[in-house]
Swiss-Prot record:
Function: Component of antiviral defense system Zorya type II, composed of ZorA, ZorB and ZorE. Expression of Zorya type II in E.coli (strain MG1655) confers resistance to phages SECphi7 and T7. While most T7 infected Zorya-containing cells undergo abortive infection, a minority produce viable phage progeny. These eventually accumulate to a high multiplicity of infection, leading to culture collapse by 170 minutes after initial infection. ZorA and ZorB probably assemble in the cell inner membrane and exert their effect there. This may be a nuclease.
Gene Ontology BP term (one): defense response to virus
Keyword check for Acetylation: no
Organism: Escherichia coli (strain ATCC 8739 / DSM 1576 / NBRC 3972 / NCIMB 8545 / WDCM 00012 / Crooks)
Domain of life: Bacteria
Protein name, per record: Zorya protein ZorE
Cleavable signal peptide: none
Top-level taxonomy: Bacteria, Pseudomonadati, Pseudomonadota, Gammaproteobacteria, Enterobacterales
Alphabetized UniProt keyword annotations: Antiviral defense
Gene name tied to this protein: zorE
InterPro entries: HNH_nuc, ZorE-like_t2
Keyword Membrane: no
């Protein structure tokens, strides 16, 4: 006997809870998390041998992580009252961690990819509590995060630092997203938001209002942005069609995570449509992935000319070997999300160019 079951309400509920641009299907497989993802969401003790090699961001089994010291003996009570009184957490291989590495003190560190800014600390005597710790300022400088090479700017970034925004800025660098981003629901939208969004995007022909990319072949990467930040204000003058990359770059939109595959699609379409042309530094930042902005900003700070975004690098037989995020053809250097080797070029991954300039290893005379 066949049963007729009306599940339309369930489908509508699923559509409301999913991120913008994503459809809901009952036959989709649920998101499975490895045990390591569960451990990292609460904090896992690690040693230096456990961490993936690299000179910029800290990575553990393909996952972007933070390092912090759980043991707050001697300052536990002070840290609970004021997180700034606690020990700093680390987002990059800064000089502080280099010193710890030399002292072989990494057994004291825990790794986590929790994005709410809370860290579980203890007093060594059985008491533990989640605390809002502060980011290491050496780490900010190490990545030149949002221009932290400037001391005044670094202090401003330190005070306003958001882990959610940080993970969003570097989401393209890792194979796995933090578990915390899947625990959120899209609250605040009206019940028929999906229909409104589809109508607005169709009227705009799925063209991003900022960068101009046509996403008719990748509609899931086409979003609708509320200019005033109020999700239930759906007057047409308050709605703006943006690609997912431009959407995450809007103020207070750090909750949008772009994967490396998604960014590659957006950049490929921009390139095919002749949109990767920039006449100013601001346009360079608009057209490149936020994860390499620290490296690009370092070159700007040192007085170099703006790079070429999305440049195809060819071998001697004119075959395209790699498409890099940003390049300085005259210097034969480039920055990219992933490692690449092209004869005659020096290609840096995220944070490597910053470090080479900071340590004095990079000079135009050597090129």
């Amino acid at each position: 006997m066949k049963l007729s079951i009306d599940i339309s309400e369930l489908i509508q509920l699923g559509k409301k809870m999913l991120p913008e641009g994503v459809d809901f299907f009952l036959d989709e497989s649920p998101i499975d998390f490895d045990p390591i993802d569960i451990e990292l969401s609460t904090g896992k003790e690690v040693s230096i041998e456990d961490l993936d090699p690299g000179s910029g961001l800290i990575s553990y089994h393909g996952r972007q992580v933070l390092l912090y010291i759980r043991d707050h003996s001697g300052r536990y009570d002070a840290a609970i009252v004021d997180g700034e009184k606690g020990k700093r957490f680390h987002i990059a291989w800064c000089r502080t961690l280099d010193e710890m590495r030399h002292k072989n003190r990494f057994e004291r560190y825990h790794a986590t990819n929790r994005i709410d800014g809370l860290f579980e600390i203890d007093d060594g005597s059985g008491r533990s509590q989640d605390v809002d710790l502060r980011v290491c300022m050496n780490c900010l400088e190490r990545l030149n995060y949002k221009g932290s090479i400037d001391k005044q700017r670094k202090r401003e970034i330190f005070k306003s630092f958001s882990l959610n925004e940080f993970f969003s800025d570097y989401s393209t660098c890792f194979r796995h997203m933090p578990k915390g981003i899947y625990d959120k629901t899209n609250s605040g939208y009206v019940e028929n938001w999906k229909e409104i969004s589809k109508e607005i995007r169709e009227k705009a022909n799925y063209v991003c209002n900022d960068c101009g990319v046509n996403l008719s072949t990748a509609k899931n990467l086409c979003h609708v942005h509320h200019k005033n930040g109020i999700k239930y204000d759906n007057h047409h003058e308050n709605l703006l069609v943006l690609c997912k990359d431009c959407h995450r770059k809007q103020p207070l939109h750090e909750g949008i995570f772009v994967t490396q595959a998604e960014m590659a699609i957006i950049q490929r379409l921009r390139s095919q449509q002749g949109l990767l042309k920039a006449e100013s530094w601001n346009e360079i930042y608009d057209l490149t992935d936020p994860s390499v902005h620290g490296d690009i900003n370092m070159m700007q700070h040192k007085g170099f000319q703006p790079p070429v975004p999305g440049l195809d690098l060819q071998n001697s037989e004119h075959e395209i070997i790699a498409t890099v995020e940003a390049a300085w053809p005259g210097l034969k250097i480039a920055v990219n999300l992933t490692p690449a080797e092209v004869e005659g070029w020096r290609i840096y991954t995220v944070g490597e160019l910053v470090k080479e300039i900071q340590t004095g290893a990079f000079t135009p005379a050597k090129l």
